[in-house]
């Protein structure tokens, strides 16, 4: 089965073609970073309009590059969670193509796509495992027994980790997107200068909270600010380093706790923040001490992309899942409500 995957949940337009026998044939990604940079964050209306402009030429080029014209068996598109306007662009486009081509179409859960992205690698993880889904909109620990067999172990009670990264970056006047810029600045910082809190690590449970850490960062920036309203460059780097270390520490502690609680020895990290080099280093070191392994997708598949949607959709279609013709999108959609296959 050859599946065209379409991702438009936020500010990236991703398309890909996955073949159940040959694997990933090709993928293309257009990022809207330049569109939203001047606003310091994603503007939903601009995101939707840009998806409309980019989808057709991206799909057209991909069909040619992969020799897939008239060879697509099904279409998978992100149907939630995400920005409703952006989701509708991809859903309408995908459903329209499916009707024109006379093939089935299926809506895919965005976070299931992220969770399954490491399956695209040469050495994928095997079920069961614990997944850390960590992005701008989600921070969740999930026990995964198979596709659709998900048990939520813990989640953020307020800000997601990626959202906290972006907000901390804004406090230091760093460009959008903030997460990668915080990580870059942190490499120049002194990790021993500031000690930031590790929220909710001193109590049982697997939930997260990053709002207090965000406030602590804001107060530290204000305390050391000069006449420009910001601390000097080195202090900003030290704050970025301390902030990143606090987030990474918190995630590592909770991941170890989740593995011990479930008695599993495999961890998958997925979502945009999983591309963070420091997080990967710390998790690999921590899990090696307890004879556990960590898996993640290549960096280009950590952020939103069409490949993960094509793969996830293909697995559900092969299992016989079918959907009505109605176009349904869900801006909010709990992962553990998905049907098992």
Curated annotation (Swiss-Prot):
It comes from the Bacteria. One of its GO terms (molecular function) is N(6)-L-threonylcarbamoyladenine synthase activity. GO terms for biological process: tRNA threonylcarbamoyladenosine modification. CDD domains: ASKHA_NBD_TsaD_bac. Coiled coil: none annotated. It is found in: Cytoplasm. It catalyses: L-threonylcarbamoyladenylate + adenosine(37) in tRNA = N(6)-L-threonylcarbamoyladenosine(37) in tRNA + AMP + H(+). Keywords: Acyltransferase, Cytoplasm, Iron, Metal-binding, Transferase, tRNA processing. Substrate binds at residues 133-137, 166, 179, 276. Its cofactor is Fe(2+). Fe cation binds at residues 110, 114, 304. PROSITE patterns: GLYCOPROTEASE. Binds 1 Fe(2+) ion per subunit. One of its GO terms (cellular component) is cytoplasm. Its main location: cytoplasm. Belongs to the KAE1 / TsaD family. Required for the formation of a threonylcarbamoyl group on adenosine at position 37 (t(6)A37) in tRNAs that read codons beginning with adenine. Is involved in the transfer of the threonylcarbamoyl moiety of threonylcarbamoyl-AMP (TC-AMP) to the N6 group of A37, together with TsaE and TsaB. TsaD likely plays a direct catalytic role in this reaction. HAMAP family: TsaD (MF_01445). This is tRNA N6-adenosine threonylcarbamoyltransferase. It comes from Saccharophagus degradans (strain 2-40 / ATCC 43961 / DSM 17024). The lineage of its organism: Bacteria, Pseudomonadati, Pseudomonadota, Gammaproteobacteria, Cellvibrionales.
